[in-house]
Amino acid sequence: MAKQAIKRAKILAVKNNNKIGVLLINLGTPDEPSVPAVRRYLRQFLSDPKVIDVPSLMRWIIVHLCILPFRPKRSAKLYQKIWMPEGSPLLVYSEMLRERVGETLGDDFCVALGMRYGKPSIETALKKLQEAQCRQLIVLPLFPQYSTSTTASALEEVRAKNSFKEMTVIDRFFEEPHYIDSMTTLIHENLNEFQPDYFLFSYHGLPERHLVKSGCQLAICNRKNNCSPISSSNENCYRAQCFETSRLIAKKLNLTDQQYGVAFQSRLGRAKWIEPYTDKYLIELSKKGIKKLMVVCPSFPVDCLETLEEIGIRAQSQWQRLGGETLKLIPSLNAHPQWVNAIAKMAKKSLQLF
């Protein structure tokens, strides 16, 4: 009862000219699918010490001498395959999400979108919220599973540009019931037209050293199999969070352990990344005789290059070459009505933290 009274008081304060600002953060996207635009984006993205976490001189050499002379041309061609008439899918769907969350929350809230890299920047989004005379700030990075290279980097940028005295952060929601329910509903909607032999949950990968820096004890972690359920010993482990999300969704779908698996995509460079790798997992599934595969990407709430091209085109092509019949990619949550409501509920719940 005390918590509910506090919440009512908070909402009453909002109505008395204390508007709440909500900052949704996504990773970012090039302005256009051209080589110069992709080069600008990659330069900013890969120069982040939380992304390529090596000494600054070594990072400069890697980015400017090993990546930027070659990768922008290849990446631009990939972006061209998924670019929408309205622009980048990541930006189009993120803006749609921002707009609908704002409509759902109502006039007492102001919702802005900021990208960690590219436009609109986090700084620009914060200025919009300040101009709207918001008094308090709720920050929600759209990364369900916490990692230093996404969530921590975004929050570091917020703190560097922020002038709000009252701020609360939703830094992860990998096991948030509203998020899990939204994912489950989305999958159920697609099961009406496609019945798979197997479900694959594919997450963005990370270098293993990032897990070590987050406190994950790899020496006692059975990395080849499912991570242990979340506890105080692995609560900051990105890989463990991914497995926990998968377990929760699978439970809602009444899947057995033999009906689904977890893998990690988008690896870059020669360093050891967390396993199993999605492309290699597809090979193993084909050897087991799986023909109809449904792929879900829970770490990407908004469709982007990694979902639409890497899975929707490249993995689809690989699956057919391996003899598979169908690879069905479940679209990201994007601006799904249940997901919009889920974000609104998480934002209102976070008011108790002020």
Swiss-Prot record:
Residues at which Fe cation binds: 204, 306
GO molecular function: ferrochelatase activity; metal ion binding
PROSITE patterns: FERROCHELATASE
Catalytic class of the enzyme: lyase
Main localization of the protein described in the UniProt heading: cytoplasm
Pfam families, sorted: Ferrochelatase (PF00762)
Catalytic activity: heme b + 2 H(+) = protoporphyrin IX + Fe(2+)
Gene3D superfamilies listed in its UniProt record: 3.40.50.1400
Biological processes per GO annotation: heme biosynthetic process
Pathway noted in the entry: Porphyrin-containing compound metabolism; protoheme biosynthesis; protoheme from protoporphyrin-IX: step 1/1
Assigned keywords, A-Z: Cytoplasm, Heme biosynthesis, Iron, Lyase, Metal-binding, Porphyrin biosynthesis
Subcellular location: Cytoplasm
InterPro entries: Ferrochelatase (IPR001015), Ferrochelatase_AS (IPR019772), Ferrochelatase_C (IPR033644), Ferrochelatase_N (IPR033659)
E.C. numbers: 4.98.1.1
GO cellular component: cytoplasm
Function: Catalyzes the ferrous insertion into protoporphyrin IX.
Family matches, as PANTHER family: FERROCHELATASE, FERROCHELATASE, MITOCHONDRIAL
Family (UniProt): Belongs to the ferrochelatase family.
Name of this chain's protein: Ferrochelatase
